[in-house]
Design a protein with these regions (language model features):
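A membrane-periplasm/extracellular boundary helix in multi-pass inner-membrane enzymes
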Residues: 88, 181, 186-194, 302-415, ...
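N-terminal signal-anchor transmembrane segment
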Residues: 1-91, 539
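Loop-to-helix entry and N-terminal half of a specific, functionally important transmembrane alpha helix
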Residues: 9-14, 266-275, 481-485, 492-493, ...
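Hydrophobic, aromatic-rich transmembrane alpha-helices
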Residues: 1, 43-59, 246-258, 295, ...
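Transmembrane alpha-helices of multi-pass inner-membrane enzymes
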Residues: 43-49, 290-297, 306-313, 502-512, ...
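Aromatic-anchored transmembrane helix interface
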Residues: 36-43, 96-155, 166, 176
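Long extracytoplasmic/lumenal interhelical loops at the membrane interface
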Residues: 402-403, 408-409, 413-437, 441-494
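Alpha-helical transmembrane segments of multi-pass inner-membrane proteins
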Residues: 139-152, 164-228, 232-305, 309-312, ...
Length: 586
């Protein structure tokens, strides 16, 4: 196996992590599994092919195959049993068979092909075959592109873990520079600058597929512009935060490793800029997860009481304070007024506001009418200028926190996220109810949409009703509910057995990290930062899908490499060291 080629491939894989939902011409929906619409599918496909070739030719690639084989066979067995059981008891066949014929995009082409070569097949018969074959393919491909990819990366670097870590840190920093730079363009766009709007108009279709400037009730489209929320290069603002939950600890690790003060200062500035942009995402996912990761880092720093870690923590906290204050000032005085969910381009909106203000100032008829109504010309001009003012009135630290963090509780029905809260909590509660009704194997992988559609038929939530109407219009096999909680969804799909096996590698890693982090020793930094990256990206599964990006699986692979290279034992037992042990390890 050519290690230089592997290094290039792994660097490409790490670089591709932020680029989700690429232009449709580059999709690999048949072979790409859960990442068929993402750039990361290409290094994964190339890696699988090259690894299989090297193993076939040289017989020296796989490592610890017996351990992985036992796990993956057990995992696939549970998922396939769950699927077969779910299909056997599936109560919504009639709804699918009587649904729209185009709910499977490829079905008309397959029918035409079979008829063209003289094989007469009824549409419903082919649909029944498809209903079984499609979820089986989904189970196999997801396992292949997730746990299989983790094992592949582990085989690449099991004897040179430090090289994988160096590539990860360097390439992630490159991605962060790109994200920060594009995020500043987004800031200029939110400031109403037309050049930034034109730049986004040109580049977003190069980064993402199905771009639209107008809202479509039934069909998902990438927003060309994203109102008052900063999304940088990402598909949407929350994905910016999800990626940063993985990348921020790696950036901190890079800062910690630097020996040059100038490089350290430059990376701290990069962190401050990215924090500023994260605050401007106004995304609860982004803020909650990244604040939690920083809080855990602070606790670990005070636990270990190492000067370099405490100095880094102080630098990061200063950067957060500066970025938060800057974001508040920008939203109050520099941002074109906009509402979450608004589709109007902000530079165009600002231009229209200025033109309206100018027209009001020179319109004699309006001045005369204002005087008649008891408003002086001077007062009218003040009102005209206010119409063209930037910033949102009433924005301060308290209102921002109430809107973007406290709103996670879902208790305030008037906040901007109230509908989203209702959808998320309702769907997750329904997942849990479905799982408890089918506790052992769940309802079967990919078969949960019909159960949600039935149980939430009369739910008052506008977003939920939109998904219901979408299913009714396009069919259960083509439309459905968003994944609003990976762990609860997997519980509904695969029961306790499937969820337990899915989480088993993560639990083993978390316990191994805990065993290391609880000991006070000087070389704790690699374990601390890598564990934070893994915990940060894993926590996003509480409210979103784990396969939104490949970050979770990258963090898992690097975690196994780091811990294996340092001879950490992987067991499910754990004990806190005695005080004497802690002192000796220090």
């Amino acid at each position: 196996m050519n290690t230089k080629f592997i290094d290039i491939l792994f660097a490409f894989l790490v670089f591709s992590l932020p680029f989700k939902y690429i232009p449709r011409a580059f999709w690999q929906t048949f072979l790409g599994g859960p990442f068929g619409q993402d750039l990361v599918v290409y290094p994964l496909l190339i890696g699988f092919i090259y690894t299989a070739y090297c193993q076939w030719k040289y017989k020296n690639v796989v490592y610890k195959w017996d351990v992985f084989r036992k796990f993956i066979f057990a995992y696939l067995a549970v998922l396939l049993i769950s699927l077969v059981w779910g299909l056997f008891n599936y109560p919504y066949y009639d709804q699918i068979l009587n649904g729209p014929a185009d709910q499977i995009e490829k079905l008309p082409r397959v029918l035409a092909l079979l008829h063209g070569i003289g094989i007469p097949v009824a549409e419903k018969a082919l649909l029944e075959i498809w209903m079984f074959a499609r979820p089986v393919k989904g189970v196999l491909f997801e396992a292949f592109y997730t746990f299989g990819a983790v094992y592949m990366i582990f085989c690449w670097y099991h004897d040179r873990a430090q090289r994988a870590i160096d590539i990860l840190l360097k390439v992630t920093t490159v991605d962060l520079v790109i994200a920060a730079s594009y995020g500043l363009v987004d800031v200029c766009y939110q400031n109403g600058q037309m050049w930034a709007q034109n730049f986004i108009t040109l580049t977003i279709p190069l980064l993402h597929g199905d771009v639209a400037a107008k809202f479509d009730y039934y069909q998902f489209h990438t927003h060309l512009f994203w109102d008052a929320q900063n999304r940088s290069i990402f598909l949407e603002p929350s994905y910016f935060g999800i990626y940063m939950a993985f990348a921020f600890p790696l950036l901190w690790w890079n800062i910690f490793k630097q020996t040059s003060k100038w490089k350290q200062a430059a990376l701290v500035v990069l962190f401050t800029v990215l924090s500023f942009e994260i605050f401007l995402t106004q995304s609860r996912t982004a803020l909650a997860v990244n604040c939690a990761v920083l809080a855990i880092f602070a606790v670990l720093c005070f636990y270990h009481m190492q000067k370099r870690l405490l100095f880094l923590l102080a630098s990061l906290c200063l950067g957060v304070v500066i970025s938060f204050a800057g974001s508040m000032e920008f939203m109050r005085f520099g941002q074109v007024p906009s509402q979450i969910g608004e589709w109007t381009p902000l530079a165009t909106k600002w231009q229209n506001m200025q033109e309206k203000s100018h027209t009001n100032n020179i319109n004699k008829q309006k001045e005369a009418q204002s005087v008649k109504e008891g408003i002086t010309v001077k007062e009218q001009k003040v009102q005209s200028k206010a119409q063209a003012a930037k910033g949102t009135a009433g924005v301060n630290a308290q209102t921002y926190i109430d809107k973007n963090l406290k709103s996670l509780s879902g208790t305030d029905k008037k906040n901007a996220h109230a509908g989203s809260n209702h959808s998320r909590f309702t769907v997750q509660k329904t997942h849990i109810r479905i799982g408890l009704e089918h506790p052992l194997f769940g309802v079967g992988t990919t078969l949960w949409q019909g159960y949600l559609r039935e149980r939430l038929d009369r739910d008052p939530g506008g977003e939920i009703q939109k998904w219901n109407k979408n299913i009714d219009k396009r069919g259960l096999l083509r439309a459905g509910f968003a994944n609003l909680g990976d762990f609860t969804l997997r519980f509904a799909e695969t029961g306790f057995l499937g969820l337990g096996l899915y989480l088993l590698p993560s639990l083993v890693l978390l316990l191994a990290y805990a065993k290391v982090l609880v000991k006070r020793h000087e070389r704790i930094a690699p374990f601390l930062f890598c564990s934070l990256s893994f915990i940060g990206i894993m926590s996003t599964g509480l409210g979103d899908g784990m396969n939104i990006t490949f970050c979770y699986w990258t963090a898992m692979a690097v975690s196994f490499l780091l811990l294996t290279a340092n001879n950490v034992k992987f067991t499910l037992s754990f004990h806190f060291p005695k005080s004497s042990e802690a002192r000796n390890d220090g």
